Every structure is written in C-alpha cells, then in structure tokens.
Amino acid sequence: TVAIIGGGPIGICCGLIARTAGASKIVVFEVNPDRAASLRETFGFTVIDPTKPGAVAEAIAMTDGLGFQRIYETSASIPGFKMVTALGRVRAHAVIIGITKEPAPLDTWKMMHEEMRLTTIRVHQQYAYAAALELVKSGSLDRELMAMITDEFELADAQKAFEFCLNDTKHIKVLIKS
C-alpha cells in the first residue's frame, strides 16, 4: 500500500512506479482540484484532498486501518510533512523527496514506536537512472508518461511558457520544443 503526498510530476512518477512494482493500493493526496481530476481520470489513482477534515483517517480506512507500507512526500509542504508519520503503519518506509523552504517537523515519537524507516532523496544514484531508463525503454509506461505533458510551447515562446506555468492550475508538465 502506497500513499503519495503531492500529485505533481514526481508524485505521478512515484505512483506509476509503485503500480508497476505491484502496489495493491495507491492513494495520492492533492490539493489542486484540477490536478486531482487528472490524477483520477488520466492515471487512475485514488485521490484525497489533504485539506479536507478526516483526510488521513479516510486514507487509513482504505488499508483496513493498518496504514500505508510506503509513503512518498513529494509536495515539499509543511502540511505534507506532518502527514508522513500519520499515514504510516508499523515498519512503514517513508521517502522524503520534496525539499521544503524551511525546517519541517516530523513525529519522531511515532516513528520510534512504529519502527518506521525514513529515507531522504536529493541526489540520485547511477543505479536509479539505469532502472528508470530500462522502465522507459520497455514502453510499458508510454501512455502515462506522454499524458503528463499537458501543454507544449515553441522555444521562441519560452517566456510565455514560464508565465503559463505560474498562472495555470490545470497543467502537469509543460514541454518547450526547439
């Protein structure tokens, strides 16, 4: 069972890889309603708005009350970090991918009592790139990876593309073509 906090491109990739690896349940927490709709419709994920009262309890109920075996924090938000330990089950493995702008609290008491493991990622290793390239070369995720590119701009319109990214709420990944 996998919980992903943040449904942006990195969160989507985490979900796709979890599905490929055989995860029985994948729940993505996403605050943006436009992006949440895309996560459901395009990628087939179960999506919960983390700002909704009872969001964590709703997700844990989907695991028969046990909590999640894997938690990926990709939102880089303080509220997202606060959810990490709340979502975990005994001996869960949490992976922090999103980098916050300031120190973020983690419930170390729960981590100790539940024997949770925490991994952080900032610099990727060669073996991870090799595995990712093999997965892409297999073609098994072609449809999903292409669906992540929601908008395209010509190189001459790069400034417009960046402005679009700042103002549009529906995009997932914007491609600038040369």
Question: What residue spans do the PLM features occupy?
Answer:
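Residues in the short beta-alpha loop(s) of Rossmann-like NAD(P)-binding domains
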Residues: V31-N32, T100, H124
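Residues forming the Rossmann-fold NAD(P)(H) cofactor-binding site
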Residues: I12-C13
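Helix-to-beta-strand junctions that scaffold the AdoMet/dcAdoMet cofactor pocket
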Residues: G88-V90
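Adenosine-nucleotide cofactor-binding segment
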Residues: I4-G7, R19-F81
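Residues at the starts of beta-strands that form the adenosine-phosphate
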Residues: T1, S24-I26, H93, R117
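C-terminal hydrophobic helical "lid"/dimerization subdomain
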Residues: K82-A86, Q126, A130-S178
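Rossmann-fold dehydrogenase core element
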Residues: A92-V95, L106-A147
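Glycine-rich Rossmann-fold phosphate-binding loop(s) that bind the pyrophosphate
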Residues: G6-P9, I99
